[in-house]
């Protein structure tokens, strides 16, 4: 998971890149932090999607009376 400090750093780098530009080292740091954030979002989304159950599937699995 991405920490609040890492999200804050991502935002700092975005602001700095807009105002004055980034050094090569900062660009690499920004790229790594962004990728970590994207991976965390994908993982969270996958977990949410995997937990979805369709109503039709639940109805089919009920015992028939």
From Swiss-Prot:
Keyword DNA damage listed: no
Domain of life: Bacteria
Keyword Cytoplasm: yes
Pfam families in the record: DUF896
Keywords for the protein's UniProt record, in alphabetical order: Cytoplasm
Subcellular location: Cytoplasm
InterPro entries attached to this UniProt entry: DUF896 (IPR009242)
Name the record gives this protein: UPF0291 protein BBR47_33060
Native source organism of the sequence: Brevibacillus brevis (strain 47 / JCM 6285 / NBRC 100599)
